Every structure is written in C-alpha cells, then in structure tokens.
C-alpha cells in the first residue's frame, strides 16, 4: 500500500509527551492517534508499537524515541514519546526532538513525582517554551477535592520553574479509558478529554517562527578562493536567507566580528538569487582574504549573534556502554566542545557542592572556552575527548 502523503497546507508544530514514569505518556500518545483516526486525521499507533521505540543516534548518542504524526483541523503535528527517563534527558539535551511545546502527563492518583519535576526543569533549561497538562487516570480518583489538590500542586510546580502556572491549560481525563473506547465522539465521557487536550494544544501552543524568517546564519564548513573573484565560504544555511548585496558578519574565533558584503551566492555551481534555510551554498565575500575566514566561524546577519567564551550549559554525560568515559570527571576538566563545525578546548566548572560527575549523569555546568565562538542560548554542542563523543549539552545562558 502506498504511503499516504500529508498535505503541507497546515502549519507544522513539534510536540511531545513528558512526565513521570508510568503516569501514562505512551497510553495518551496512543489514545490521541486512535481518537483522531476516527476522523481520518491520524493513523492508529498501538501502545506496544510506541513503547518499543526504535533506537536512533544523535551526536553519537543512542536514544529510543517513538515518532507519531497526526493533524487537527488547524495544524499538522509531529509528536515524540520516549520509553525511558534517560531517553528524555538525552532527547531534550541533544535537541534530537526539538519541541515547540510539550504535553506534561501527571497521574491524578499520584500527583507530581520526582521525574515530573525533573522534566519541567529540563523543559525550562533547554527552552521548551510552552506546556499543556493532561491530568491522567482521573477514573481512579473518586474525590473531586483530590483532583483540585493535584491541579493546584501541578500549577505551583510549573510556577516554581517560571512557567505561567496559573494560565496553563490543565485537561482532566483517562487516556486508558479513551484508548479502550476509541469511539472518537466529542460527547463521549472518555474521548472528549482527548479532544479538549488537542483544542488546548491548538490554542495555547503558538505556531513557531519558521527557520526562513529568522535572522540569517550559516556555519562555515569550507573556504576556498576563486582567482580574480575572491574568497568563497561554503556551508548549510541554518536559518534565515541571504542574497547578493547583503551585509554579513564573520563571527567566532576572533574577539570581534568582522563585517563584509556577499557579492555572490551559488548552489551546485549555479547562481542563486537567494539562499534560504536548508540550502547548501557558497557565499562569495567582498575584500576577505582566504586566511581571514575559517571553518568554525559563522556568517550571520550583523548584530544577531556575538562571540563568547563563557557560558552555562545543561549536559548529559555518556555511560561507558554508550562509548563514553569509564570514570568520573572533576572540577577543571578540559575536554573539547564541538560547536556546529569545530572543536574548541574549554574548562569545566562544576556547581557548588558537586564534587564529581559520573558517566550517565546530567548536570548544569559553567564552561570557559579558550577561544570565542558564536554562541546563543539553546545552541547544542557535543563534548569530545580525542575525537570521541563523551557528552552532549545545550547552552542555557551566557556569562560574561
């Protein structure tokens, strides 16, 4: 059977389920596909199919992730669900599954648990901008006051981590009952909570700005000179667009950015009017010598990104089984940090009270690089030793 093609007429949003183990994330994911399938907006994905998620590799790290897609009247969604807690940590830190918003699943019978807190903290750290809550297993709670209490606890917890706890939509229901019923009717006692949840996701999580509409940035992968014409920097445009005559800055590996003008844009030896996010292009740069630009720098819209040496990050350290270190590291650890296209040595400062970091841990650290790199919040990087990946991280703040 030919695969159905999703029409790209609707805005696209990436979301995922987060929350404590056994609170019903995977059941909810299955229930969403079953209810939306009744109106032809999804293909049914059974629980065990989602739970046995395939392994993927991102930045040398193995992560189990299930991907489902579905649509509502308004949008097309790509939804990620992870079987294990460690998979969430890795997923959120590596950005393997970038989330524009998340559905936090909390069991009404248990209330917020340790991983509920940890996932909210991670979402705050790695920049998941919006959260909608599904209060699950409501069929197991007879006392409406208890439901109100859990509702309050969840809102307080979200506010603790600087999410707007009072405004966040909380939908109460039972994913298991909705999955077992799967009639998909909006008036159904169980299926209606799934519709309410999808309405909340549609309304509350805004459509993200497309990469093409953001300020131009292209990591420099290679540089060569064309006799009589000048220097060409090649790379894949990460965001925004570039055309002939645009002023750009060369940022990184130097203390100050350098301005230049793009005098030509080519793709596969053909001249382009404009290069956009996702294109592999060569940019001809005015008055720049072959020696004045190198791999590891970026071309960017002037003023949009600056070179920095000091920043804070949330990192995940690979286990021995994942090919990482066999031993812990301590304050003053000096690995290489791989940003976009290049390795830069840096020194690690551990948080107060943390003596050492073990393989398999995730921790917040401060890093001081020996040379400045174009850095901003949300930028992902790998931690390497001698070309081997030993960790992954995301920039959570700049310290100057």
From Swiss-Prot:
EC number of this enzyme: 3.6.5.3
InterPro entries for this protein: EF-Tu_GTP-bd, EF-Tu_GTPase, EFTu-like_2, EFTU_2, G_TR_CS, P-loop_NTPase, Small_GTP-bd, T_Tr_GTP-bd_dom
Main subcellular localisation: cytoplasm
GTP-binding as UniProt keyword: yes
Region (G2): 60-64
Residues binding Mg(2+): 26
Pfam families in the record: GTP_EFTU, GTP_EFTU_D2, GTP_EFTU_D3
Magnesium found in the keyword field: yes
Binding site for GTP: 19-26, 81-85, 136-139
Subcellular location: Cytoplasm
PROSITE patterns attached to this UniProt entry: G_TR_1, G_TR_2
Catalytic activity field: GTP + H2O = GDP + phosphate + H(+)
Start and end residues of each stretch annotated as G3: 81-84
Span list, region G5: 174-176
UniProt-annotated stretches for the region G4: 136-139
Region (G1): 19-26
Function comment: GTP hydrolase that promotes the GTP-dependent binding of aminoacyl-tRNA to the A-site of ribosomes during protein biosynthesis.
Subunit-level organization: Monomer.
Family classification: Belongs to the TRAFAC class translation factor GTPase superfamily. Classic translation factor GTPase family. EF-Tu/EF-1A subfamily.
Protein name: Elongation factor Tu 2
Organism: Pelotomaculum thermopropionicum (strain DSM 13744 / JCM 10971 / SI)
């Amino acid at each position: 059977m030919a695969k159905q093609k999703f029409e790209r007429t609707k805005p696209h949003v990436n979301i995922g389920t987060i929350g404590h183990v056994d609170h019903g994330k995977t059941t909810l994911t299955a229930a969403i596909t079953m209810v939306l399938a009744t109106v032809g907006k999804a293909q049914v994905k059974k629980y065990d199919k989602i739970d046995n998620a395939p392994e993927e590799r991102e930045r040398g790290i193995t992560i189990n992730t299930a991907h489902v897609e579905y649509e509502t009247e308004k949008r097309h969604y790509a939804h990620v669900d992870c079987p294990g807690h460690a998979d969430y940590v890795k997923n959120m830190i590596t950005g393997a599954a970038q989330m524009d918003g998340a559905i936090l699943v909390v069991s009404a019978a248990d209330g917020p648990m340790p991983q509920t807190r940890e996932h909210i903290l991670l979402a705050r750290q790695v920049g998941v901008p919006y959260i909608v809550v599904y209060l699950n297993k409501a069929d197991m709670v007879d006392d409406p006051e208890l439901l109100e209490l859990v509702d309050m606890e969840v809102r307080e917890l979200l506010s603790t981590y600087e999410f707007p706890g009072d405004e966040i939509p909380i939908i109460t229901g039972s994913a298991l009952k909705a999955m077992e019923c799967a009639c998909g009717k909006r008036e159904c006692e169980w299926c209606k909570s799934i519709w309410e949840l999808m309405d909340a996701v549609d309304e509350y999580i805004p459509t993200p700005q497309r990469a093409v509409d953001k300020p131009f940035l292209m990591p420099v992968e290679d540089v060569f000179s064309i006799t009589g014409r000048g220097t060409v920097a090649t790379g894949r445009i990460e965001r925004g667009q570039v055309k002939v005559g645009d002023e750009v800055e060369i940022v990184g590996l130097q203390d100050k950015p350098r301005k230049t003008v793009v005098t030509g844009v080519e793709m596969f030896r053909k001249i382009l009017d404009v290069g956009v996010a996702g294109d592999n292009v060569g940019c001809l740069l005015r008055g720049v010598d072959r020696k004045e630009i190198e791999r590891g720098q970026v071309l960017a819209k002037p003023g949009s990104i600056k070179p920095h040496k000091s920043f804070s990050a949330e990192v995940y350290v690979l286990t021995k089984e994942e090919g990482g270190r066999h031993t812990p590291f301590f304050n003053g650890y000096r690995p290489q940090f791989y940003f976009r296209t290049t390795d830069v040595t840096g020194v690690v400062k551990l948080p107060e009270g943390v003596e050492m970091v073990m393989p398999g841990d995730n921790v917040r650290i401060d890093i001081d690089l020996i040379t400045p790199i174009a850095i901003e919040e949300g930028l992902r990087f790998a931690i390497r030793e001698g070309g081997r990946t030993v960790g992954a991280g995301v920039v959570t703040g700049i310290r100057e």
